[in-house]
Amino acid sequence: MSHTSRVFFPPAFVEQMQQLLPDADEFQRFITSSQLPLRRSLRVNTLKISVDDFLTLVEPYQWALTPIPWCQEGFWISRDDADTLPLGSTAEHLAGLFYIQEASSMLPVSALFDGGDMPQRVMDMAAAPGSKTTQIAAHMGNRGAILANEYSASRVKVLHANLSRCGVSNTAMTHFDGRVFGPALPECFDAVLLDAPCSGEGVVRKDADALRNWSQSSTEEIAATQQALINSAFHALRPGGTLVYSTCTLNTRENQQVVNGLLEQYPDAVKVEPLDTLFMGAERATTAEGYLHVFPHIFDSEGFFVARLRKVASVPPMPQPGYKVGKPPFTPLNRVQQQEVIAAAASVGLRWDTELKLWQRDKELWLFPSEIEPLLGRVRFSRIGLKLAETFPKGFRWQHHAAVALADAASANAFELNSNEAEEWYRGRDIYPERDLPASELIICYQQRPIGIAKKVGSRIKNNYPRELVRDGKLFTL
């Protein structure tokens, strides 16, 4: 059976899908749906703004926002101005008020926190570009700690940029093959999300050529990697903890069989927690085992698979790694030093929760989530928490990323930009406001939300927006 649509379907893939969807009408719905444009969707970042306040803020734009059933913060979006202004160039996106995220990919984190679970230490084993890490951080309210790992070096920078834009402060980043965590950090996490690398069969609506390199042999190779990763994730999970395994592919080899492989290996230590009541209508995509197997035609979305597992008992540990990590190059501040920094930061409108602790490396001051401290020296971190400031004989140079996460828009030194000035800010240009500036160090705000920190130099605001984030092209002033 051949298809001459814009989407490339390998014959063996079509045969596989016919076996998965033996009803001819349903199979045809799958084929038809897979060739339709994917609906755009976003998730409101509640670290920055409530859903109600966001809806009020964007109401003048006349965006058509349809709630996503499995994510209270998620909406499908239709815009009349989509051709004139990219969604990623809107002021609300640049300020981290929302994340452009495919609807199905919101499912794994919703499953992770289903039933009121509130883990204190979470690992996102394959984290880039950051949609799920930022979603986890929002669920946790920036409390506790997240270890966000990404194996692909080219994606680590994107992960950090998204964490920063969204004001995430409770995350430590690593850059490893996920197979290291079971041996290196056994029983260290209350929850683990493994959104596993996969063959991507569910993303053809976004990429018509996604299946060009598809083959059953490559599926087998990928599944072997997934099996090793889920085993590592399970060992890193403490007894009583939750493991969510997900992919954006459709075949059972990378989905049900990988999860069932873990169940067969540890039959007395793993319990499946069914997802049929995760949201209204979830039973339409629930398998006999209790997993979610979302085909594109069921909810008019990408294809996705999600399983939620509970670790009910310890298992024999994996062999310990032979390498030594070495002592991290940071030292905690003493109480007097902490009080000095806290007071200085508060004077410019920067405040943080007591779960964040002050550490120093040379002239750099950092805020580490305290939940990550027991892991220091056990794996090498590429970045931990927030860089707060650099120290100088005359004071501190406060950092942009810390301001975005910690600044108080109601502080005395907050300065609200108009839309033209905000555009100039994101373009990396100094600003020349025609009104008085309240202080020498300013929390820069737009729409009553902090978007950076800057110094007053005479009558101008010296732009401190990071060079790597500076935007060109059309921005939000139409």
UniProtKB/Swiss-Prot annotation:
The keyword Cytoplasm applies. PROSITE patterns: NOL1_NOP2_SUN, SAM_MT_RSMB_NOP. Its EC number is 2.1.1.178. S-adenosyl-L-methionine binds at A126, A127, A128, P129, G130, S131, K132, E150, D177, D195. PANTHER family: 28S RRNA (CYTOSINE(4447)-C(5))-METHYLTRANSFERASE-RELATED, NOP2 YEAST -RELATED NOL1/NOP2/FMU SUN DOMAIN-CONTAINING. It comes from Erwinia tasmaniensis (strain DSM 17950 / CFBP 7177 / CIP 109463 / NCPPB 4357 / Et1/99). It comes from the Bacteria. This is Ribosomal RNA small subunit methyltransferase F. Keywords: Cytoplasm, Methyltransferase, RNA-binding, rRNA processing, S-adenosyl-L-methionine, Transferase. It catalyses: cytidine(1407) in 16S rRNA + S-adenosyl-L-methionine = 5-methylcytidine(1407) in 16S rRNA + S-adenosyl-L-homocysteine + H(+). The gene is rsmF. GO terms for cellular component: cytoplasm. The active site is at C248 (nucleophile). It is found in: Cytoplasm. One of its GO terms (biological process) is rRNA base methylation.
